[in-house]
Amino acid sequence: MVGIGTWSCRVDTMFFSGSGTVKVFDDNGKYGFNLDIPGVKVPDIEIKEVIENGNKVHAVLTSSVMPNKDFEIEAEFEENTFTGYIKVPILGKVKLKDGKRIA
């Protein structure tokens, strides 16, 4: 599994600017994610699909905020850093900035 650990990054859009953390873990052979954004109630998230390709992970998910729309996340992990984006309905691709391992 790629990207196991706790990571932080920044996101800047016209609706939200800030930092968050995501814990990526092995949930009995499938990917598990816990997302924390200080000061924000994180909506319910359902992971529909995860594809691993080398050091990249691509995930498709849905959220209670837009229940009939797919979100996509792609991240490429190095030892202690990552780059990537989240594709949000209506907004398009939003870059994940300053991705780094914190635990």
What are these regions (language model features)?
Residues 1-77, 85-103:
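Central antiparallel beta-sheet cores of small beta-barrel/beta-sandwich binding domains
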